[in-house]
Amino acid sequence: MRYTVSAPASLHAAIQLPASKSISNRALILHSLAHGNILPRNLSDCDDTIVMTRALDGNPGHIDILAAGTAMRFLTAYLSVTPGTRIITGTQRMQQRPIRILVDALRELGARIEYVGNEGFPPLRITGTELTGSEISLAGNVSSQYISALLMIGTVLPKGLRLHLTGDIISRPYINLTLQLMRDFGAQADWVSEDCITVSPGGYTDTPFTVESDWSAASYWYQMMAIEGIKNEKIKGGDRSSAKESEDSTKEEAHTAEIELLGLFAHSYQGDSRGAEVFTRLGVHTEYTDRGVKLTRKGTPATRLDEDMVDIPDLAQTFVVTCCLMDIPFRFTGLQSLKIKETDRITALITELRKLRS
């Protein structure tokens, strides 16, 4: 099937963004550990959150999380501290994604977890029990979802949790997001040094909570604004016509183009909000309003973009494609986690961009 996609004459829109998946999935775990009756409002409708909601509803004995990596990690820890014996599995790709680091850490705390298939990979058989351990060490360069999974169950452990992180700590904003949400639900949890987090025992409080809009989803609208100046260039067979031909006809529209993204905040919990600052270097101006953010084009894009993406790995694909479309050379580092996502995102990027001869 083939589609023809045409740019609008001018770019003006007010967009209601989807709710944050990262916040939704954490809020659901915290809500369940609080034995809450008040379901968080404005939950994401993405597959990951739907899978998480179903898994937490009714305590099934067999849980298929499909391709939802976040659900696999968070639920592995959650099931370790809640009553019952459950098998958790996923797609064939999910069964190729390693989980040994998290399982070993949970076992060190006293969890009862068995591998049903290949050692170190899902599926898992988990029997919930009271975890007697309270202190563990973990490499700081592992997936932040492992760290978040452990932190969220920390306050329901009899002695709480003291988590030491060794080496470089990647995706620190996602760890901070987890800690902030835990505090919103009544837990005492914080950094006590640059590499150590403590979580006090005591459990969670059932708390009314509304999920904010998703900064990751916002990145695609930032991308549209960034490439507004080249929208009349034709991309066909990988050959793009000169930007000069469309410069005059698009100059006025580019100047007045405006997108309003509803439900975003300046002081967001989400680490991906940093994307707004990076897009400034690509000519996108962000103005915060009482409804969200307003995007316009302003200034001259950078001639080269060098960025450490270790704290915003989920935005890497957006920036790679944006830079390719804008003919801006770039060098991005800190992308080691992209190879173990639902697919190898680096390989996927290279494969798809080659189709455009990028």
Residues of each region from the PLM?
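Short, structured segments at the rim of ligand-binding sites
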Residues: 1-358
